[in-house]
Amino acid sequence: TRSGETADTLAAVRLAREAGATVLAVTNIMGSQATRDSDAVMYTRAGLEIGVAATKTFVAQVAAMYLLALRLAELRGTLPHERVVELVAEIKAIPDKMDETIENVSESVVEISGRHYDQSFFLFLGRHIGLPVCLEGALKLKEVSYIPSDAYAAGEMKHGPIALLDENTPVVCVATDSPILDKMLSNIEEVR
């Protein structure tokens, strides 16, 4: 939780505790209600979040959870210490990679946004690790640009989303180098 005060999140914490679950709060705000209601807390300390899109706190929370997963994997013996060290080094390199990305995509952003700024709807499709990226991308588009958008698992697109498309609908596909890349590429061909 970014603020640690969202009513829905606090209700989920209460339900989880009533069911006997151990609750971990990952938040940016020290002393928030979520921190008081949880069994353990990880503070991201990402600084004040000014924008509604909460990009900074989202990225910090993903990084915190990834670090937790790496440590658990090391303790359980599913990842050797050397690999954990390598992966933590990759996390630390993210700011430089973000700078490179911003520099490399700026022209494309101008061109693509100029072509699609007046569209009434965007569809995001992804599989595997690309699906949560699509969900967050669709949310960011709604929050920042006020453009209606939705995100779906690409394998489910025939069960509704494809009916929303016409020849002008922008479809954002996140295709990662994953074991199911071929299936994602097939989905991309279907929406062309």
Where are these regions (language model features)?
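Glycine-rich phosphate-binding loops that contact phosphosugars or nucleotide phosphates
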Residues: 1-93, 176-179, 183-192
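Active-site phosphate/pyrophosphate-binding segments
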Residues: 40-170
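Short catalytic-loop micro-motif centered on adjacent basic/acidic residues
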Residues: 25, 124, 173
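C-terminal active-site/capping subdomain that shapes the small-molecule cofactor and substrate pocket
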Residues: 151, 158-161, 167-192
